């Protein structure tokens, strides 16, 4: 794919090369834009975490994880428009959960990690997610609860 340099006059002109093939309409969805980014930057770093251990995923590696997660969500009964909650510290896993949910066609319900457990539980009851992604620190707390979706 031909690389188009960004200028002040045409900051989004590069999208014209994919319009009608990678996406239809004026603007791509986030999953469509991510696939375009994979084509443009495939082997470049996409997600990096430095502590406690350095983890870095390329765009291509991230897409592979995102597609696997989207397939798992679909096999778990998540369908277009279903809610999937995501709560956790900033990490590659959080980003993959967010993108995987979008790739599955579901609605992401991001929940602030800084909230107290009872506040999170109230949000989960209101959102009625089919699946709730939570990090290891809170897994035990929410895996035993009912009405919070599959944890």
Model-derived features: where do they sit?
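Short, flexible loop segments at the rims of nucleotide/cofactor-binding pockets, characterized by
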Residues: 22-26, 61, 109-111
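Hydrophobic face of alpha-helices
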Residues: 31, 63-66, 139
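A short, structure-level motif marking secondary-structure boundaries and short turns
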Residues: 18-20, 33, 54-55, 81-83, ...
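AMP-dependent adenylate-forming
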Residues: 7-15, 33-58
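Conserved AMP-binding/adenylate-forming core of the ANL superfamily
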Residues: 26, 43-99, 116-121
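Flexible, non-catalytic linker and terminal segments flanking ANL/adenylate-forming cores
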Residues: 1-28
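Structural core segment of the AMP-binding/adenylate-forming
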Residues: 1, 75-76, 103-151
């Amino acid at each position: 794919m031909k690389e188009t340099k960004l200028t002040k006059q045409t900051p989004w002109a590069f999208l014209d090369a994919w319009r009608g093939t990678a996406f239809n309409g004026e603007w791509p969805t986030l999953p469509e834009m991510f696939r375009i980014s994979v084509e443009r930057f495939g082997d470049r770093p996409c997600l990096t975490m430095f502590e406690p251990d350095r983890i870095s995923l390329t765009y291509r590696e991230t897409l592979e994880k995102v597609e696997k997660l989207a397939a798992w969500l679909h096999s778990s009964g998540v369908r277009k428009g279903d809610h999937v909650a995501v709560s956790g510290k900033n990490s590659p896993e959080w980003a993959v959960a967010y993108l995987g949910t979008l790739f599955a066609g579901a609605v992401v319900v991001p929940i602030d990690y800084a909230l107290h457990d009872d506040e999170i539980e109230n949000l989960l009851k209101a959102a009625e997610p089919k699946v709730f992604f939570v990090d290891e620190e809170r897994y035990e707390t929410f895996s035993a609860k009912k009405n919070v979706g599959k944890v």
